[in-house]
């Protein structure tokens, strides 16, 4: 687990790697949603949105990114990670919620 540094969310986001944390969480999340035994139609649609985040030119100039998607679907993500007992990802999700959402 990485060492927590002092952050300054409300003024500058100083010390917060929001994009990096979001990318790390998506990698953890993909361990679950890429598993055919764990996915469903909701997560398949979520993966389509992740693809759009990776290529904004294909989304009619609408900018999506991992942090936006995490914020938009935070409760669904919590439910999935709790269901599969992924404590490491839950800890990171909570950190993202506190620091960046």
From Swiss-Prot:
Highest taxon, organism lineage = Bacteria
Keyword annotations for this protein? Nitrogen fixation
Q: Name one Pfam family in it.
A: CowN
- The portions of this protein that span the membrane are none
Does Cell cycle count among this protein's keywords? no
GO term, biological process aspect, one: nitrogen fixation
What InterPro entries does its record include? Answer: CowN
Q: What does this protein do?
A: Is required to sustain N(2)-dependent growth in the presence of low levels of carbon monoxide (CO). Probably acts by protecting the N(2) fixation ability of the nitrogenase complex, which is inactivated in the presence of CO.
Q: Which family does it belong to?
A: Belongs to the CowN family.
What protein is this chain from? N(2)-fixation sustaining protein CowN
Name its species. Answer: Pelobacter propionicus (strain DSM 2379 / NBRC 103807 / OttBd1)
